[in-house]
UniProtKB/Swiss-Prot annotation:
The lineage of its organism: Eukaryota, Discoba, Euglenozoa, Kinetoplastea, Metakinetoplastina. It is found in: Cell projection, Cilium, Flagellum; Cytoplasm, Cytoskeleton. Its main location: other. This is 69 kDa paraflagellar rod protein. Transmembrane segments: none annotated. Coiled coil: none annotated. It comes from Trypanosoma brucei brucei. Heterodimer of a 69 kDa and a 73 kDa protein. Residues 335-355 are annotated as: Calmodulin-binding. GO terms for molecular function: calmodulin binding. One of its GO terms (cellular component) is cytoplasm. Coded by two tandemly repeated genes with identical ORF: PFRA and PFRB. Major component of the paraflagellar rod (PFR). The PFR is a highly ordered lattices of fibrous proteins that are located inside the flagellum and assume a fixed orientation with respect to the microtubular axoneme. InterPro entries: Flagellar_rod, PFR_Component.
Amino acid sequence: MSGKEVEGVVSPADQQQPAVPEVTDITLEAARKQKIHNLKLKTACLSNEEYVQDLHVSEWSETQKQKLQAAHEKAHELLASVEGGTKWSLTEAYDIKKLMRVCGLEMSVRELYKPEDKPQFMEIVALKKTMNELKQHHNKTRTVSFTGMIDNAIAKLEKIEDELRRSQLDASEMAQVPVAALKNIEDTMNVAVVQTALLGNEEQIKAQLAAVEKANEIRNVAIADGEMAIAEEQYYIKAQLLEHLVELVADKFRIIGQTEDENKSFSKIHEVQKKSFQESASIKDAKRRLKQHCEDDLRNLHDAIQKADLEDAEAMKRFATQKEKSERFIHENLDKQDEAWRRIQELERVLQRLGTERFEEVKRRIEENDREEKRKVEYQQFLDVCGQHKKLLELSVYNCDLALRCMGMLEEIVAEGCSAVKSRHDKTNDELSDLRLQVHQEYLEAFRRLYKTLGQLVYKKEKRLEEIDRNIRTTHIQLEFAIETFDPNAKLHSDKKKDLYKLRAQVEEELEMLKDKMAQALEMFGPTEDALNQAGIDFVHPAEEVESGNMDRRSKMVEYRAHLAKQEEVKIAAEREELKRSKMLQSQQYRGRTMPQITQ
């Protein structure tokens, strides 16, 4: 330290800086009293020295010599009192700004953690509460996938809370790191299980299938009894039921799509983890920088204290040397005074000069003692300020280490949470893919039944239309014969012909309606057909089965006509030949493809 700092002399700029401790009225009053006490001690000592000088110029007798000896003894006691009783209370403290300037410190008190600082960890407690709420989530099917991760997170959060209670850290910022990951975990647990969502749909499908089977039974009984009107009505009922069945199966795609859309948002969980790790890295870097600055300041403080200790030791050594030298000087002075008394007559001037030298030496020694006491006070104050700041720096290093440990545990929580979400997301996608393929197969069976039913109705309506056309031609011929012969039944034939035309229009309208339904059902089957082909699943297209069934029915009808009308053998043989060629063409067209037996 410089002489200016030892003597307590500071610049006006330094005087404007806040002192540690702060100068108060009590401190100033104590300093004033101490100064008065010091002044009294010095005045008493110097007055005695002046008295000694007066004795040198007064009467020179043995009595005077004895008085002088007594004065010397008193002077020795007073000098010891001055050296032992002089104390200094500086009115200006050794403040932290001067310490930072002298020691080259970077961290100010404002930037450091302090013992009176209270830890702020309520956000961590809130995170623990959130994890406990997730553990009690109502969606138990989803909760099972996250139980292990949640238990680990709660244990780590409790450990973080215990660490923070022993620190001065504000955990508000670090508590925000896992918030995004926890939000994704909660959203994942809120996604409904697709199997549960499909339960209602499955029940409706079972009810529709039961209704279809009942319609089949009624139709078969009606056909066996020859009640073709009832059989036709049951065909329409079955078609309507199958249409609704197809709609129910198709609705599964909507439910699966909703679940898939809800699950799709979690595919970017790696971005949430990346962002959380970036926030964590930012906090850790800040704490590392603070720790590094504090450690650098601790090293600088340690070096400054060592330097101050060396300077203090040297100053004390110098003071002790000077004091020893002064003691020798005073003893020598006394010896010389004794010698002067023996030679008092001729050495008067010498005695007076020596008295003056003694007075000056005592005065210098008192001033030197003042400077030494001031230096000791400044040195002790320097050590006190260094000690206080050193504690703050060490406390800040401890808090930085604790913050780094806490952030490490929070990163583990984020990583485990994100891994659990990703695992659940991948598993859900696999389940949805398998379920979608299963629904496509189910849709194929429902479409096959609907399409075959509509195909049978179309076939029968076409045959019905052909029969009506034959009846119209027959009625027309009968009408012509009746007109030719003025037969009174001509009116009946004419009315019958009109009724047949009306019936034909009605049947033709129904036929068009059925064909439209077949076309619409075939168009809706397109996505399922593509999905099954992409999955590599072989199946016979229901359109092919309808064509094959129509061929079989035509063959059976031809055989029936062969038995009923032997006279039409030539015509029947020709139709058989046509059917044979059609079957051959069909077998060549679908050669190599399996056609499983379909149960109607």
